[in-house]
Design a protein with these regions (language model features):
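Cell-envelope/extracellular polymer assembly enzymes that use nucleotide-activated donors
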Residues: 44-47, 77, 229
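Acidic helix N-cap motif at the loop->helix transition within catalytic regions
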Residues: 60, 87-94, 102, 144
Length: 409
């Protein structure tokens, strides 16, 4: 029993230090920092890349929003990768004004493969672009997106994540859960880290990469979370990613639990894959470079599945001590509340606070706020499942919200 006590106490200290660190960093999200100075003044040329698999219902609106950018038309091109499509995605995208590349490879369906296939061709062509932007086909892009990313390039940034807002935040408790989660992460993880000189992470869509950065390697990713993988590879190489709150892209979220479950299972397996491939390189980078940014990247990996395992061990240890008559019922309840409050209750207050300071419309979201702990709690079951079953194939998330930028604005 003494060993259980010692293990439990060590894990308590470990998790306490971890969360104190996270809380300290997150406070930087409340401080307004000055914009970085410009290191050059140039109108950069972009290519917007849209991987799309059977997205005929939504891709036209995305292309339209890109064509309506408040940016000189001769300085950007729109490419749609019609990836294993069996519908009219290619026709609709071309009619909307995009340049369409058709790809057929049933064995390699993920966005990472499509990006690598497309960028390899552009690298071989020595295409005349300064940077590329990546969007999901269901997105709608704010008209100032390219202007903001051009400014970021002029500030010397090479990889920048834009602000992924939500097209359908109040449609269901599931889409609301995504909205609460992303809004909170945007401010208290990504912006906070950017403010203190650490690295935010790419977020799947609405990001910019300087073209020169991939000319030697291509888009070389192999996990189910190509965005996180690419981010970690940059951090290992000592490159800090940028953040652009005012480069806004609206993304459609699942509205049904089954679709959300499948998507988040894929993300969790992707994180496990990233942990497998990049935990040691990150640890080596911490040892060699001795930078807080590398250490923070390592903590991100450790803070996902490993920290979940630690939390589960801590929670279950309470039952072990209780069953051996070394803890009262009251003590068991108190210790379980110490786990439940930060896991299920704190997210409600953090979501409400984030909406308030970011000027989000709170009233339409109030009907779903009580369900947010259920959304976050379901991640516990997802993590447990994915620890034991990781042979998850990529499955398409259906996008049906045909909304244009005028309807959102």
């Amino acid at each position: 029993m003494e060993y259980i006590y010692l293990l439990r106490q060590a894990l308590v200290y470990l998790t306490t230090i971890f969360w104190i660190y996270e809380l300290t960093i997150s406070l930087a999200a409340l401080i307004k920092f000055k914009e970085k100075p410009l290191v050059t003044q140039k109108k950069h040329k972009f290519m917007a890349i849209i991987p799309a698999h059977n997205e005929e219902k939504v891709v036209g609106n995305l292309v339209e929003s890109l064509r309506n950018q408040d940016y000189d038309k001769e300085f950007f091109d729109i490419y749609v990768i019609a990836d294993n499509c069996t519908d009219n995605t290619a026709i609709i995208a071309r009619d909307a004004g995009a340049i369409v590349y058709k790809r057929f490879d049933e064995a390699h369906k993920t966005k990472g493969y499509a990006l690598n296939w497309f960028l390899k061709q552009k690298i071989e062509e020595n295409a005349d672009y300064d940077a590329f932007l990546v969007f999901d086909a269901d997105n709608i892009v704010d008209k100032n997106f390219l202007n903001v990313m051009n400014r970021k390039l002029c500030q010397g940034e090479e990889v920048v994540q834009g602000y992924k807002d939500i097209k359908n935040p109040s449609e269901s408790w599931i889409s609301a859960g995504y909205a609460f989660f992303y809004w909170t992460m945007h401010r208290f993880y990504h912006l906070a880290r950017y403010n203190v000189g650490l690295s935010p992470l790419l977020n799947g869509t609405g990001f910019m990469v300087k073209f020169d950065l991939v000319k030697n390697t291509g888009w070389d990713t192999r996990t189910l979370t190509e965005d996180i993988e690419f981010s970690l590879k940059q951090i290992i190489n000592g490159k800090k990613l940028g953040w652009a709150t005012d480069a806004i892209v609206y993304d459609e979220q699942p509205e049904k639990f089954v679709a959300s479950w499948k998507q988040r299972c894929r993300w969790t397996v992707g994180h496990i894959q990233c942990m497998k491939y990049y935990m040691k390189p990150l640890a080596d980078a911490v040892k060699e470079k001795k930078t807080i940014m590398n250490f923070d990247g390592l903590l991100y990996i450790l803070g996902s599945v490993p920290m979940f395992i630690v939390s589960m061990i801590l929670m279950l240890s309470n039952f072990g001590i209780y069953f051996f008559d070394s803890m009262s019922v009251e003590g068991l309840i108190v210790n379980l509340l110490k786990f439940a409050i930060p896991t299920f209750i704190f997210p409600i207050f953090s979501a409400l606070f984030t909406m308030y300071i970011d000027g989000k419309k709170i009233k339409p979201m109030l009907k779903w706020i009580a369900f947010y702990p259920l959304f976050m709690g379901s991640w516990i079951l997802i993590n447990i499942k994915c620890l034991f079953k990781q042979d998850i194939a990529w499955e398409k998330i259906e996008h049906v919200r045909s909304i244009n930028i005028k309807e959102i604005a």
